[in-house]
């Protein structure tokens, strides 16, 4: 649909969309007068996941389910998304700020020959143009930007936009497009599964406990993790702690890493 706002689904790799998608779909529906559509690249979609996207406000789910989409490789996602966008001609393509969406959406915008507004914190329609507000200069200023042509491509900072209210029983059309799955030019030499801490992710947490050099070593982060489990917080780390190898890069909360909008 030419006026549709696409929402690129970020999931937990187990067939469940992350809760940040309620924000993305809710904002897309608001801006497009209810013409929000979800685009899901996955190797294992679930009926519960499709139901959740519909209840958050997606009118249609473009489902590309193929083993080639996991583990994530940007070249495969980009090729499939670009071909689908050329056929369906969406007005806008929105995605949450996550590690893989940062890379994928940037490559997709370049492939489509359009601009990208990253880390957006607000949107408004100005006639038939979309205006995005995004931080610049390490968050010291806010800039309003727009696009020379559609599709308008943007990433949304999590925990900023109002999540869509779930509408139990709402249904969406599920479209399984027949687009080619690109052949990967890269191969995995080794794959290591991350061990779950059982704590909220930085991008979705309302409370973050962060430790830096003062932790004196990686073994002391268990103190923060124990406290985080009690209060329902996520655990982050400073750049110095990450550079020292005390915590993985996904825990870094300073410029260039995880984008979080915690309350505490």
What are these regions (language model features)?
Residues 1-263:
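N-terminal glycine-rich FAD/FM-binding segment characteristic of electron-transfer flavoproteins
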């Amino acid at each position: 649909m030419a006026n549709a706002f696409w929402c690129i689904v970020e999931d937990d790799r187990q067939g469940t969309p992350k809760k940040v998608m309620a924000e993305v779909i809710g904002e897309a529906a608001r801006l497009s007068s209810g013409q929000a559509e979800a685009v899901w690249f996955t190797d294992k979609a679930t009926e519960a996941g499709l139901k959740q996207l519909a209840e958050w406000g997606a009118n249609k789910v473009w489902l590309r389910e193929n083993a080639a989409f996991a583990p994530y490789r940007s070249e495969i996602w980009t090729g499939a998304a670009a071909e689908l966008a050329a056929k369906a001609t969406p007005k806008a393509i929105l995605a949450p700020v996550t590690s893989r969406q940062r890379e994928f959406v940037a490559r997709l915008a370049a492939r489509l020959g359009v601009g990208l507004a990253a880390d957006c914190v607000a949107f408004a329609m100005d006639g038939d143009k979309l205006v995005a507000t995004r931080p610049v200069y390490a968050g010291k200023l806010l800039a309003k930007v727009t696009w020379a042509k559609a599709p308008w491509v943007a990433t949304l900072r999590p925990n900023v936009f109002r999540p869509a209210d779930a509408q139990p029983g709402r249904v969406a059309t599920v479209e399984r497009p027949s687009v080619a799955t690109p052949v990967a030019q890269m191969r995995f030499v080794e794959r290591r599964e991350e061990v779950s801490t059982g704590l909220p992710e930085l991008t979705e947490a309302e409370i973050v406990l962060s430790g830096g050099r003062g932790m004196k070593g990686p073994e002391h982060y268990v103190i923060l993790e124990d406290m985080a489990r009690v209060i329902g917080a996520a655990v982050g780390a400073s750049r110095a702690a990450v550079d020292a190898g005390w915590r993985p890069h996904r825990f870094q909360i300073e410029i260039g890493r995880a984008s979080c909008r915690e309350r505490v």
